[in-house]
């Protein structure tokens, strides 16, 4: 559980935020599990921070280097950059459709990123943390290429998982090397690899082990899954890790004698959080402002990642920052989710198990998916997406509890008022109800600050339930004018509070709600404690959401199959993405 003290600094430093989402590998469109584990959760938390008025930068981008892209480009007879240019464009469009708004969504092919990575590794090399070693590495005689770790698959020596990659077992999370695998195979063609001699450059993690252990043990903000996994790896002892590869597609290694080598994609991609911040402020014409974030002890750096990415963010990335010899602020915490599974199974494109970001947005508006995914976020255990649960959340909670309450209140207010009266006050009974809502608001705020986004949504729903209960029991339309005005004033104030607590989760709907309530500009978190402003001109209310029937679901599933039939016909990856026509 996250320590709330991250929202204040005991030494009086100004608190700033760098929010980083795991960079999507743009070999393909991300699925819902990818989104909830990183991009969507990071967007929701960033929106909360901005509502609070914090100085925050949300950075992420397209991870486009490495063997998978290189191999796919060879198969298609095109250059890797041709593939990544098109896929990057598609991801940018999808993020806009989903309402995911990084301050800088960049790419690992950006000139700033390539410059920063080479500069950082030059400093690390000059500081003596890098050495060379001649290794026998897996080489596929059929494909005639050296195989990066992740392109060797076999049985994990720790847990027996038969499809472990040569860099990490996705089942138990252990960091691996290809030689550790039992019965290794080439992931491209299935051939048994040969071992051939080649020279590579290594990061000597052993020399950084004590500092990394001290950093992790002393960090009360790390969630349990991240802390325990990291300490488990440290207990076994850190080993040097090869940071170069024989790929052509990547960032050229800057070390003397390393011509023809590129930086291993995992070691350059994590540095993207810094390079993306630099690039963001360069675009704003504020060249040195990035230092206010990365060299300020009051900065809170938080990563939104899946649990399989924990070691790269709690061990590798801090190690790289330490090895530069510069006084970087260390990452404060990770929000490392468990897995989202689909109808009890792992997401699988080939078996059509799951839903992908492009498919989802073709079926329903983004806020339906955003609400459900955050409501069902796998924060402490795996979550299971089922169509039945999706219908239940959309129909019973999103529409009936939240949407229906808002629409009933706005309809009453518009019908009797049109404009919020200037002399209206809450009677004592209504003040007590409003006070209970403000108590729940405190809990919602705590949940956001602990990055328990699922709990924040659940508590927001409780606010709507209080309003619905009041409407059903009090029946304001039967009251005297004074009591009616008090009731609607209180209920409109509850709607205002509710809208702010849900604004990070369903921004499209809340912006429309604010328009209907008469707000020309967006609200801030502090406004959630203030009653509705008098004099607001109300617009004609429209329902924010609608129910989805079983019959409509069947139509959606049929459309989903049709979309996938279209995607399957595409030769190129960008032809296998489904985007609405502009």
UniProtKB/Swiss-Prot annotation:
A motif ('KMSKS' region) lies at residues 346-350. It is found in: Cytoplasm. Its cofactor is Zn(2+). It is an enzyme of class 6 (ligase). It catalyses: tRNA(Met) + L-methionine + ATP = L-methionyl-tRNA(Met) + AMP + diphosphate. ATP binds at residue 349. Zn(2+) binds at residues 156, 159, 169, 172. The keyword Hydrolase does not apply. Its main location: cytoplasm. The keyword Nucleotide-binding applies. One of its GO terms (cellular component) is aminoacyl-tRNA synthetase multienzyme complex. InterPro entries: Anticodon_Met, Met-tRNA_ligase_1, Met-tRNA_synth, Methionyl/Leucyl_tRNA_Synth, MetRS_core, MetRS_Zn, Rossmann-like_a/b/a_fold, tRNAsynth_Ia_anticodon-bd. Transmembrane segments: none annotated. One of its GO terms (molecular function) is methionine-tRNA ligase activity. Keywords: Aminoacyl-tRNA synthetase, ATP-binding, Cytoplasm, Ligase, Metal-binding, Nucleotide-binding, Protein biosynthesis, Zinc. One of its GO terms (biological process) is methionyl-tRNA aminoacylation. Binds 1 zinc ion per subunit. It comes from the Archaea. A motif ('HIGH' region) lies at residues 24-34. Its EC number is 6.1.1.10. Belongs to the class-I aminoacyl-tRNA synthetase family. MetG type 1 subfamily. Is required not only for elongation of protein synthesis but also for the initiation of all mRNA translation through initiator tRNA(fMet) aminoacylation. This is Methionine--tRNA ligase. It comes from Caldivirga maquilingensis (strain ATCC 700844 / DSM 13496 / JCM 10307 / IC-167). The gene is metG.
């Amino acid at each position: 559980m996250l320590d709330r003290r991250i929202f204040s600094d005991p030494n009086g430093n100004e608190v700033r935020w760098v929010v980083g989402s795991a960079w999507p590998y743009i070999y393909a469109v991300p699925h819902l599990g990818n989104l909830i584990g990183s991009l969507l959760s990071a967007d929701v938390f960033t929106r909360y921070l901005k509502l609070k008025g914090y100085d925050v930068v949300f950075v992420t981008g397209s991870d486009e280097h490495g063997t998978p892209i290189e191999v796919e480009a060879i198969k298609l007879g095109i250059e890797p950059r041709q593939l990544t240019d098109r896929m990057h464009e598609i991801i940018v469009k999808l993020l806009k459709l989903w309402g995911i708004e990084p301050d800088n969504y960049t790419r690992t092919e950006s000139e700033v990123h390539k410059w920063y990575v080479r500069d950082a590794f030059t400093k690390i090399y000059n500081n003596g943390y890098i050495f060379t070693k001649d290794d026998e590495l897996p080489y596929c005689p059929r494909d005639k290429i050296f195989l990066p770790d992740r392109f060797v698959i076999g049985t994990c020596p720790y847990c027996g998982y038969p499809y472990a990659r040569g860099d990490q077992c996705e089942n138990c999370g252990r960091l691996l090397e290809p030689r550790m695998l039992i019965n290794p195979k080439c992931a491209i063609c299935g051939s048994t690899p040969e071992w051939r001699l080649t020279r590579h450059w290594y990061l000597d993690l052993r020399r950084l082990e004590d500092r990394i252990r001290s950093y992790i043990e002393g960090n009360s903000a790390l969630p349990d899954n991240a802390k325990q996994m990291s300490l488990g790896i440290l207990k076994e002892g850190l080993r040097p890790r090869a940071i170069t590869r024989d790929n052509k597609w990547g960032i050229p290694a800057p070390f003397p004698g390393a011509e023809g080598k590129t930086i291993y994609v995992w070691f350059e991609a994590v540095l993207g959080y810094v390079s993306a911040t630099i690039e963001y402020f360069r675009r704003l014409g504020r060249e040195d402002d990035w230092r206010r974030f990365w060299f300020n002890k009051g900065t809170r750096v938080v990563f939104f990642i899946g649990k399989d990415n924990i070691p790269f963010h709690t061990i590798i990335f801090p190690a790289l920052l330490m090895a530069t010899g510069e006084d970087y602020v260390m990452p404060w915490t990770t929000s490392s989710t468990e897995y989202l599974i689909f109808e009890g199974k792992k997401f699988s494109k080939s078996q059509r198990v799951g839903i992908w970001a492009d498919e989802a947005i073709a079926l329903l508006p983004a806020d339906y998916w955003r609400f459900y995914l955050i409501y069902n976020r796998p924060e402490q255990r795996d979550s299971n997406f089922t169509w039945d649960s999706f219908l239940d959340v959309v129909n019973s909670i999103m529409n009936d509890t939240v949407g229906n309450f808002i629409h009933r209140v706005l309809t009453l207010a518009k019908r009797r008022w049109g404009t919020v009266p200037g002399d209206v006050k809450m009677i004592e009974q209504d003040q007590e109800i409003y006070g209970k809502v403000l108590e729940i608001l405190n809990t919602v705020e705590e949940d956001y600050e602990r990055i328990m986004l699922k709990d924040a949504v659940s508590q927001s729903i409780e606010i709507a339930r209080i309003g619905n209960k009041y409407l059903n029991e009090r029946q304001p339309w039967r009251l005297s004018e004074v009591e009616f005005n008090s009731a609607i004033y209180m209920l409109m104030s509850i709607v205002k509070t509710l809208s702010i607590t849900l604004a990070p989760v369903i921004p499209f709907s809340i912006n429309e709600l604010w328009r209907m309530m008469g707000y020309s500009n967006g609200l801030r978190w502090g406004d959630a404690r203030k009653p509705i402003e008098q004099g607001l001109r109300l617009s004609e209310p429209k329902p924010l959401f609608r129910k989805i029937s079983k019959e409509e679901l069947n139509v959606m599933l049929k459309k989903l199959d049709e979309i996938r039939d279209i995607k399957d016909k595409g030769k190129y990856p960008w032809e296998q993405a489904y985007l609405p026509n502009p």
